[in-house]
Amino acid sequence: METFLFLFEMLGTIAFAASGAVLGVRKGLDVFGVCILGLTTACGGGMVRDVLLGNTPPAAFQNPTASAVAVVTSLIMFLSGVRHLLMGNQRRYDLFMLLMDSAGFGIFTVMGVRVAWNCVEAPSLYLLVFVGVLTGVGGGLLRDVMAGDMPYIFVKHIYACASLVGAVICGVLRQPAGEMTAMLVGAAAVFAIRCLSAHYRWNLPHPNA
């Protein structure tokens, strides 16, 4: 189980770091800025979660592995060949961002549920879902603010709602189905909802619609 959790978290870290770094490249940041944006996207949600739950210092400071993986991923995204591959085609860029963001989003949502479950005795479903959603959206929220964009969770494709559904699924399935199954199903649900909402342009009601 520990190996699964480590690999699962690293996959989410790579996905979120890649989405942050590529956005930094698109915004014309230098290599330091790209790394900071990738690192913040990958670790920001977990830091906010840990502070909320009283787990200080946050896990990212206790074990630098995730931070190192995020920085290495960001440097790879900054390579000339990768930049030209993604920046030269808008559809390719959009698809890459959707897949990376959705994967990281789903993984960190259920990781947040797991951490909350292990930190609090007999946690309520509300707490599990709240912490899961906060962990999932936190990194992307910080990424968008630092990049000077309107946070994606407020304007596009039922972003936070996907995290909400995945967190509920993970929290409900944990006891009857087991931790691993609950996390996989919850993360898959978030990923699927995000991709489907982007493809079919599902959005919440908007005043300018």
For the regions a language model picked out, list residue spans one by one.
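Helix-coil boundary and interhelical linker segments in multi-pass alpha-helical membrane proteins
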Residues: 1-4, 51-61, 113-127, 172-182
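Structural signature of hydrophobic alpha-helical transmembrane segments
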Residues: 1-13, 59-72, 123-136
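The first (N-terminal) embedded transmembrane alpha-helix
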Residues: 6-19, 34-40
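C-terminal ends of transmembrane helices
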Residues: 17-27, 50, 76-93, 141-151, ...
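Short, structured motif recognition centered on aromatic/hydrophobic residues
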Residues: 36-40, 47-53, 130, 134, ...
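Small-residue-rich segments of transmembrane alpha-helices in multi-pass membrane proteins
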Residues: 38-46, 96-112, 132-134, 158-171
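Loop-to-transmembrane alpha-helix initiation sites
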Residues: 62-68, 124, 155-163, 177-187
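Ordered, amphipathic secondary-structure segments that act as subunit-interaction surfaces
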Residues: 70-114
